[in-house]
UniProtKB/Swiss-Prot annotation:
This enzyme's EC code(s): 7.6.2.-
CDD domains, alphabetized: ABC_Iron-Siderophores_B12_Hemin
Entry keyword Ribosomal protein: no
Protein name: Hemin import ATP-binding protein HmuV
Record keywords: ATP-binding, Cell inner membrane, Cell membrane, Membrane, Nucleotide-binding, Translocase, Transport
Keyword rRNA processing attached: no
SMART domains linked: AAA
Residues annotated to bind ATP: G31, P32, N33, G34, A35, G36, K37, S38
Organism: Shewanella oneidensis (strain ATCC 700550 / JCM 31522 / CIP 106686 / LMG 19005 / NCIMB 14063 / MR-1)
GO MF: ATP binding; ATP hydrolysis activity
UniProt similarity note: Belongs to the ABC transporter superfamily. Heme (hemin) importer (TC 3.A.1.14.5) family.
Amino acid sequence: MDRLSYAIGDKAVLNNIRVQFQPGSVTALLGPNGAGKSTLLKALCQEIPSAQGSIKLGHCQLVDWPRAELAKSLAVLPQHASLTFPFTVDEVVAMGLYPLTLSQKEGQQLVTKWLAEVGVLHLARRSYPTLSGGEKQRVQLARVLTQLSQSPFPPILLLDEPTSALDLAQQHKVLALAKNLAHKHAYTVIVVLHDLNQAARYSDRVIVLKQGEIVSEGTPNDALSIDIIRQVWDYEPEFIPAPQGDYPLIF
């Protein structure tokens, strides 16, 4: 991503963003409301055609990719996994087969593989609307992983506040799954979060945005300094020491 900028009228939403995302790692996008986090994800999905600058996947400009081909390499896990139709869980996951060219048997094997990977294979024949919020989010994760199964590049998984509607236990399960996917399967995972402690625990790299600009970038220890937290979130943080090697809790 090079010199990416986007404005609505006179208001700069993204300003000269230059960043590279690495396969096999989790990058957390942090910042207050209106900082440009979700807009950055939309730009990656080619949902902002008027944005200036360039975004490349491999050596190719993302804008030159046919949408059906891009869908094989890049997918979004939405903030709210809302489906009201009475599909079964395996039918929801099978929706991810849409951009792929597979036989029925191969498709079913993929659905089973990813349901097992995210820990909900036992729910395969359950009606999707009857699931809990955390179960729905894991089913949706299995769906997008199915979609990315034929990617010619290390797949890119975008998570836009994926834990905002979940209880604490489910939040940690979803983020732990995302981190495992990055490290085990070489996915490029980019996640929008508001919780600094979750970002510190589950990301390899943090990008802090304020008013559409990157103000800090690096490992959680480097990027989330006291000065940055004061500058971006305008409050005095309290750090509680953690065991050696762990990131301290921030309050």
